[in-house]
Each structure stands twice: as C-alpha cells, then as structure tokens.
A protein has these predicted regions:
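The feature marks the mature, well-folded catalytic cores of soluble enzymes
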Residues: 1-172
Length: 172
C-alpha cells in the first residue's frame, strides 16, 4: 500500500499545479468547448470506377505494383507479380482463399512462424480488410485473410489482394 499512497500523493501534487495554473481563468472558459468547424468532406463524390482509379493513382505514388484481376484469376495475377519481383516463396495466412495461391511458387501457411523464419521468406500474400482511395492506404485487421501483422512487416515484399468493393473513397 505504500506505492498506492505515493501515487495518490503525486496525483494530488499534479492536480494542485493544474488548479493553480487555471485559477485566473473564468469558469465559462473552462466548461464551454469551442465549436469546431467540420468543413472537411465526410462523404465521397466519385463513382465506383473513380474510386478505384484514385486508389490506383495513390498506390502508385507509394511505388506499389498493381495488377487488376477477376476473382477467379487472382492466383494467376499473383503468380505474374511474383515472377516480376523474383519471388520464389510466399507465406500466407491459413484463411487465405485457396484460389488466390499461385501455382509454381512455394507457399507456406503461417501457423505462428517466428520472425526469424519469416525473414527467410521472399514475400507475404494476404488479403485486406479495406482500402482508402484518397490516401492509398490499405487496412489489415489481423484476422482472416489479412493474417498476423508480422506477415506484412517482416518479409521484404507484401502482396495484398484487395477486392474492388473493399475500396472506399474516404473515411468520415
């Protein structure tokens, strides 16, 4: 309980300093929150095709490689990207759809691989939770096809499949 008394005493000292600093501020200023302007866009105005185009432009600004594919040809598109990048081995989350996995590439399912093990794998292949066109941001949620966070951080290359309906123009 000695530690608790010390923390409580320190708390009182800090609060006392705050009260002293605010002693000459009128009560009205302390309780009234100023109105904040909300002039930013809360909703997008682009068509679905425009949203995808904007995302592609922003992603390319980050030097991302983009390959458009139908759902049924994702595995072929991934194999093409792997060939372009010289990727011989991929780590994937267990929940990644089977048809996204390319043929001709060594695919290792991640069941808790250590960081050192991941460091020896060329690339990770994951899905995404969402993507934001305005910023070119990809959101991973650490679940399902996104896999563990380490998959997008440790291998030198991250290949991410983003479905068109997952791309939003902006976030309110």
């Amino acid at each position: 309980m000695v530690g608790a008394a010390r923390v409580s005493g320190a708390r009182e000292v800090i609060l006392g300093r705050i009260r002293a600093a605010l002693a000459d501020v009128p009560d009205a200023e302390l309780t009234a929150a100023p109105a904040l302007p909300r002039a930013y866009e809360r909703r997008g105005s682009l068509t679905p095709a425009g949203v995808l185009d904007l995302f592609a432009r922003r992603a390319r600004e980050y030097r991302a490689t983009l390959e458009l594919a139908s759902e049924s040809s994702v595995g072929v598109a991934v194999a093409k990207v792997c060939g372009q990048l010289g990727v011989g081995g991929l780590v994937v989350p267990p929940a990644l759809p089977a048809h996204w996995r390319p043929s001709g590439i060594d695919v290792i399912e991640d069941h808790g691989l250590a960081g050192r093990e991941l460091d020896h794998i060329d690339a990770a292949l994951t899905g995404a939770a969402a993507a934001i066109a305005r910023t070119g941001t990809v959101l991973l949620d650490g679940d399902g096809s996104s896999g563990r966070r380490l998959l997008s951080l440790i291998p030198d290359t991250h290949i991410c499949v983003i479905r068109a309906e997952q791309v939003v123009e902006t976030v309110p």
